[in-house]
């Protein structure tokens, strides 16, 4: 949003140390709470689609006398700093206690647009394949993106901590990158891990993680 002071306060419902922001990279399923300071005028709110020329636009009007900007105007903030996860710090109340992971579950994100064969660890979703986890463990999910697209990965039933300490349940894994997140296995059940680009999940980029209460 142009010409407005903005500050991130939460991501996926968890508090962070307030961080001033020009622009955000938001994946499907991610949520951010942002406080904005409005002046008198008309301000465009613009969302660009990653990898496409399309954009969604809205206007925030605080003064009936102000003229609206031209529809094609690009807010200068879109060319400013795009805040990344590493720049955010958690509020102390939501920080996971320090602990070494008891196990690591490696999740390689694979597939191509040409074949549309999106998968995890080279295999399409199979309800009989369940990542082994035990109740009470600190589990590290290691997302390894082998594709040329970015994938917002979501874990059901839990929230996880990123290396910076912020808590989330959905995280963007950029092309060619590896991202480790940690969570506590404290909610027994059978839980989905999937790409929140739902057409990728439908193609096969999802798997299961499960454990029983008191399992050791």
How should each PLM-predicted stretch be described?
Residues 1, 35-36, 41-47, 107, ...:
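Short, structured motif recognition centered on aromatic/hydrophobic residues
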Residues 1-82, 166-169:
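Histidine- and aromatic-rich segments of cupredoxin/plastocyanin-like copper-binding domains
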Residues 4, 39, 50, 65, ...:
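Solvent-exposed coil/turn segments that connect beta secondary-structure elements
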Residues 8-40, 127-134, 157-189, 215-216:
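Extracytoplasmic beta-sandwich strand-turn segments characteristic of Greek-key/jelly-roll folds
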Residues 13-14, 56-151, 157-161, 168, ...:
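Edge beta-strand plus adjacent loop/short-helix module at the start
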Residues 41-44, 54, 147-151, 203:
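Short loop/turn segments at connectors of secondary-structure elements within structured domains
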Residues 48-52, 144-146, 196-200:
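Beta-strand-rich extracellular modules
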Residues 180-216:
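TerminUS-proximal long segments
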């Amino acid at each position: 949003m142009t010409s407005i002071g903005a500050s991130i306060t939460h991501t996926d419902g968890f508090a962070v140390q307030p961080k001033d922001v020009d622009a955000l990279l938001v994946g499907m399923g991610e949520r951010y709470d942002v406080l904005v300071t409005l002046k008198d005028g008309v301000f465009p709110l613009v969302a660009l689609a990653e990898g496409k020329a399309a954009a969604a636009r809205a206007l925030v009007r605080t003064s009936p006398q102000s003229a609206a900007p031209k529809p094609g105007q690009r807010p200068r903030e879109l060319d400013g700093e795009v805040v990344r996860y590493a720049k955010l710090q958690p509020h102390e109340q939501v920080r996971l206690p320090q602990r070494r992971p008891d196990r690591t579950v490696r999740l390689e994100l694979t597939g191509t647009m040409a074949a549309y064969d999106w998968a995890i660890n080279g295999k399409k979703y199979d309800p009989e394949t369940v990542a082994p986890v035990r109740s009470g463990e600190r589990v590290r999910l290691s997302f390894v993106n082998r594709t040329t697209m970015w994938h917002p990965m979501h874990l059901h039933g839990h929230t996880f901590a990123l290396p910076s300490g912020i808590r989330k349940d959905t995280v963007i894994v950029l092309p060619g990158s590896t991202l480790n997140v940690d969570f506590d296995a404290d909610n027994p059940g059978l839980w989905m891990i999937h790409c929140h680009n739902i057409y990728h999940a439908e193609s096969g980029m999802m798997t299961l993680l499960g454990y029983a209460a008191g399992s050791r």
